[in-house]
Amino acid sequence: MTINLGIIMDPISSINIKKDSSFAILLEAQNRKYKIYYMELKDLYLKDNKPYSHTKLLRIKNNKKQWFTLEQQKDVSLSNLDVILMRKNPPINRAYIYATYILEQAERNGSYIINKPSSLRSYNEKLFTTTHFPQYIPKTLITSNSTKIHNFIKTYKDIIIKPLHGMAGLSIFRIKEHDPNTSVIIETMTKYETIPCISQNYITDIQKGDKRILIINGIPFPWCLARIPKKHENRGNLSIGGYGNTQKLSKNDWEIALSIAPTLNKKGIFFAGIDIIGTKLTEINITSPTCIQEIEQDTGISISTIILDNLEKNLKKRKTNRYL
């Protein structure tokens, strides 16, 4: 039976097909003859309390000049789709939040939404670590109060400060004690004490890499991508010039990943990417985890295949349970 798969993502015209994780998943889905319905956030709507979206049938190919075609525009009931992948990148703004409510209605009507809409809405990727796994994180302060941030710097001498809603290494600053730019950075980050941000002690092991570990259906993948900063940089993100080094998970990585995985499963988070620097957990990415292609290329193991095998297994379970 053909699986009807919906995907909500940023414009497909703007992706880098050599790196994009959604593209890798879609390519495998197409190989399995899934019918793929392409959507952007703006396409979703509720009518008479029923969830719909304007969609286009998506066909893709591994060609960097022309990698997609969109056909047969039509509005569909989200409840008629077997599975919907919510792969829209942050920020988690009002439009994103409203979309999760629409998806939640489709979920109530039987659609399988990855990841669970209420979890996408409830668990900030940086706060999630502090509220659920404080034993694994660096020294952390979340506040908009400039005096408290100044005192945190005094205590730890060398810190990282970043927005709670950011991604891809954007707006991340390293501040050392007596840095002449400290006050202006804090003013900028907190928007003059109106928006909280997260401060953590600087971890020197960042120079060995910020490790992205993928967890699929409650099972950690045994290889990770260590994203190593370029010279004179504190951020390892590939999008800003860091380079990737695929590694086997260390004993500490396994301990953290196996501790986190059951909670993710319980909360309907089918696919996540956790970030570890040294021995410390820094983020749990649940909106649109990346690094599939980089790890696949280095290991020869198709993560996309593992994802869709598990997705299909879960779909079968859901259908069986529905008829019990």
From Swiss-Prot:
<keyword id="KW-0547">Nucleotide-binding</keyword>
<comment type="pathway">
    <text>Sulfur metabolism; glutathione biosynthesis; glutathione from L-cysteine and L-glutamate: step 2/2.</text>
</comment>
<feature type="domain" description="ATP-grasp">
    <location>
        <begin position="125"/>
        <end position="312"/>
    </location>
</feature>
<dbReference type="GO" id="GO:0005524">
    <property type="term" value="F:ATP binding"/>
</dbReference>
<keyword id="KW-0317">Glutathione biosynthesis</keyword>
<feature type="binding site">
    <location>
        <position position="283"/>
    </location>
    <ligand>
        <name>Mg(2+)</name>
    </ligand>
</feature>
<dbReference type="InterPro" id="IPR004215">
    <property type="entry name" value="GSHS_N"/>
</dbReference>
<keyword id="KW-0067">ATP-binding</keyword>
<dbReference type="Pfam" id="PF02951">
    <property type="entry name" value="GSH-S_N"/>
</dbReference>
<dbReference type="GO" id="GO:0004363">
    <property type="term" value="F:glutathione synthase activity"/>
</dbReference>
<dbReference type="InterPro" id="IPR011761">
    <property type="entry name" value="ATP-grasp"/>
</dbReference>
<dbReference type="GO" id="GO:0005737">
    <property type="term" value="C:cytoplasm"/>
</dbReference>
<dbReference type="InterPro" id="IPR016185">
    <property type="entry name" value="PreATP-grasp_dom_sf"/>
</dbReference>
<comment type="similarity">
    <text>Belongs to the prokaryotic GSH synthase family.</text>
</comment>
<protein>
    <recommendedName>
        <fullName>Glutathione synthetase</fullName>
        <ecNumber>6.3.2.3</ecNumber>
    </recommendedName>
</protein>
<keyword id="KW-0460">Magnesium</keyword>
<dbReference type="Pfam" id="PF02955">
    <property type="entry name" value="GSH-S_ATP"/>
</dbReference>
<keyword id="KW-0479">Metal-binding</keyword>
<keyword id="KW-0436">Ligase</keyword>
<dbReference type="GO" id="GO:0046872">
    <property type="term" value="F:metal ion binding"/>
</dbReference>
<dbReference type="InterPro" id="IPR004218">
    <property type="entry name" value="GSHS_ATP-bd"/>
</dbReference>
<dbReference type="InterPro" id="IPR006284">
    <property type="entry name" value="Glut_synth_pro"/>
</dbReference>
<dbReference type="InterPro" id="IPR013815">
    <property type="entry name" value="ATP_grasp_subdomain_1"/>
</dbReference>
<feature type="binding site">
    <location>
        <begin position="152"/>
        <end position="209"/>
    </location>
    <ligand>
        <name>ATP</name>
    </ligand>
</feature>
<keyword id="KW-0464">Manganese</keyword>
<feature type="binding site">
    <location>
        <position position="285"/>
    </location>
    <ligand>
        <name>Mg(2+)</name>
    </ligand>
</feature>
